[in-house]
């Protein structure tokens, strides 16, 4: 669980503050937690993300952002919805949410995506990401998930944009993080069978956690890093 929430933070810090290393992200932790609270996340989720980042960066309770319980109570609506739900409904935008969780595209990439960006390479479908890509880095994303859904949706759009508008309330960063975690799990080999050179060993508080380097690299490429 901590890994998932830390991935959310790292993806956000890379895209908004252009961090180049994990350590560079530490100074943005409190900004992230304050933003997450204002987005209307539950007290439980904010606390969970706080604990995850405190562990990741060895941050003391004196340094970490203190959640504003009164503010959080005020933003909860009587029927249990969050304030951000006024502006965005996953149910009403289920195709967008499903697409994001299956492709990991950035907001700017989604805004520029057209039906004709669905291509074939050696008989296999890919999404060609060229417009809106960060740093102008072109990449082709294989359809690892929801292949029929994505092909059907994009093919139906022709030269038109796949999504006319990306709502501001859509939490694209979290969908990217979900995609990253999902793709890593799909690609990762049995860690016990890998030679030392193909393993990534975490340090400090995450010491003991070990990941498949090859799978991590493929996920990074798919995300456009």
Spans of features found by a protein language model:
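Short basic/aromatic active-site micro-motif
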Residues: 166-216, 225
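N-terminal core-binding DNA-recognition domain of tyrosine recombinases/integrases
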Residues: 1-72
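DNA breakage-rejoining catalytic core of tyrosine-based enzymes
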Residues: 41, 63-90, 134-145, 158
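Hydrophobic (often cysteine-bearing) scaffold residues that line and stabilize catalytic clefts
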Residues: 45, 49, 92-93, 172, ...
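Basic, Lys/Arg- and aromatic-enriched nucleic-acid-binding interface segment
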Residues: 77-107, 210-216
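Alpha-helix N-cap/helix-start motif at helix boundaries, enriched for small hydrophobics
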Residues: 108-113, 219
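Conserved tyrosine-mediated DNA breakage-rejoining catalytic core shared by Y-recombinases
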Residues: 79, 112-149
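C-terminal catalytic core of Y-nucleophile DNA break-rejoin enzymes
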Residues: 133-179
């Amino acid at each position: 669980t901590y890994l998932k929430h830390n991935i959310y933070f790292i993806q956000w810090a890379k895209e908004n503050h252009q961090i180049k290393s994990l350590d560079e992200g530490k100074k943005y932790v409190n900004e992230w937690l304050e933003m997450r609270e204002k987005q209307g996340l539950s007290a439980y989720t904010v606390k969970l993300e706080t604990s995850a980042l405190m562990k990741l960066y060895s941050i003391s309770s004196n340094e970490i952002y203190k959640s504003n319980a009164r503010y959080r109570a005020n933003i909860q609506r009587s029927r249990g919805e969050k304030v951000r739900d006024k502006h965005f409904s996953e149910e009403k935008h289920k195709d967008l949410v499903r697409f994001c969780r299956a492709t990991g595209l950035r907001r700017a990439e989604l805004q520029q995506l057209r039906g004709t960006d669905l291509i074939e390479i050696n008989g296999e479908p890919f999404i060609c990401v060229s417009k809106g890509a960060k740093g102008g880095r072109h990449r082709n994303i294989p359809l690892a998930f929801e292949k029929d859904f994505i092909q059907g949706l994009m093919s139906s759009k022709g030269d038109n944009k796949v999504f006319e508008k990306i709502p501001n309330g859509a939490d694209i960063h979290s969908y990217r993080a979900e995609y990253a975690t999902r793709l890593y799990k799909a690609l990762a080999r049995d860690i016990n069978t890998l030679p030392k050179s193909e393993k990534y060993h975490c340090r400090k508080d995450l010491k003991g956690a070990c990941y498949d380097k090859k799978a991590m690299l493929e996920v990074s490429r798919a995300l456009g890093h």
